[in-house]
């Protein structure tokens, strides 16, 4: 038991001091998985891409499956973070909509290849299925709660029940994000159009500048 604690302490200390190497491994793993798939990809592929030794890999991750799970959690957190809009007036639905929709679309476009792999793994891996469900459902339910708060305060008159509206807008964002993944130059136009559609469906009260 003491040996286990010592090993964990060493690993934790190195996590703090060598965070850049861990970050490179994560970025490399996402690129390798996107190119090769989870099955064919190897630890050697990841370390070569990251320019980190195999020994360095095992300081942070026990296997390629573990780093894949860490990536899945990171994607989930990226979508949740897209709904957090620091520096934006949360009482302004227009500003919140533009910022959060832009962040969500950008995150989905960036992680699209990995999302496809996550969906595949979710069919056979219960732990991955739970993560996949969180990726899809947590942002939607959080968005629905936000719509309800706006409605209760008289700042919105949504065209549908909040959860249904949140799902619909999420689907629109995903569709546009897929297009942006192939055509990045359309990002700003997409954010503008999706934001306009969302605000119309939300029945947002016009802001003071309008």
Model-derived regions: residue spans:
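Amphipathic C-terminal alpha-helical segment
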Residues: 107-110, 114-117, 145, 166-186, ...
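Short, hydrophobic secondary-structure boundary micro-motifs
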Residues: 115-118, 130-131, 159, 209-210
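Amphipathic alpha-helical packing segments from all-alpha helical-bundle domains
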Residues: 77-80, 107-110, 126-153, 163-167, ...
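Short coil/turn segments at alpha/beta junctions that flank glycine-rich nucleotide-binding fingerprints
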Residues: 35-39, 111, 153
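Hydrophobic alpha-helical connector segments
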Residues: 70, 84-113, 162-169, 191
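N-terminal intrinsically disordered/low-complexity leader segments
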Residues: 1-20, 157-159, 206-210
